[in-house]
Amino acid sequence: IFWNDEEIEPKKTLNIPVVIMAGGLGTRLYPYTKILPKPLIPIGEIPIVEHIMNRFNQYISNEFFLVVNHKKNMIKAYFNEIEKNYKVNYVNEEEPLGTGGGLSLLKGKIVSTFILSNCDILIEEDYEKIYNFHKKENNLITMVCSLKNIKIPYGVIEIGKTGEIEEMREKPELSFFTNTGMYIVEPKVINELEDNKAIGFPDIIEKYKQNG
């Protein structure tokens, strides 16, 4: 499913645990992440990950699991000091394991449907609607996607195998879905992961696709 830019009114009728992957090095934000871990990079007066958690708390969740690694003590110190209306659990990742490997550390800790999110994306959407869609479709994993439109500022030429022009399009506009980094996931996915094995979440999705 995908999200758009409509403003959503808060309503909390569910309480779903949220797992946030907060252990990455944040290399794309260097040199800022030389000082701060990516989750604590401020947006306005508070860190990006706190924005994310506040929004989930406002709509759908009172409990969070932060998978931490890089500069994890700074993240723990921050959330241990602030006033908050939700519970924060820390899952220590001793070495980089990717999203899938990090989730394997949650075996026995999550026994119900949960939300999985990156630590640097804020989704403005009706989370309950996404959850209900996930349950209605009986999915193991539901990926939240964003529809993007990009206009190419040039004429686009499609060339055949022998070099002949097959089609010309002047400044076409392309539409495609992108992965937002937010998912609804069943606990079965955690239980079936190999312990402490580095694996990305797209690889996990592909495995389930191949297995039908």
Q: Residue ranges of each PLM-predicted region?
A:
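Conserved N-terminal catalytic core of the sugar/cofactor nucleotidyltransferase
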Residues: I46-C119, E124, K129, I159, ...
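Short, high-confidence coil segments that cap the C-terminus of an alpha-helix
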Residues: S61, V111, N138-N139, G212
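N-terminal glycine-rich phosphate-binding loop and ensuing alpha1 helix
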Residues: K11-I75
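Catalytic-core segments of class I nucleotidyltransferases/pyrophosphorylases
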Residues: F114-I115, L122, E128-K135, K148-K151, ...
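Short beta-strand/turn micro-motifs composed of small residues
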Residues: A22, V68, N118, C145-S146
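A short, conserved acidic/glycine-rich loop-to-beta-strand motif
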Residues: E137-L147
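Short acidic-glycine loop/turn motifs at beta-strand connectors
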Residues: E158-E164
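Short beta->alpha transition motifs characteristic of CBS
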Residues: I1-P10, K171
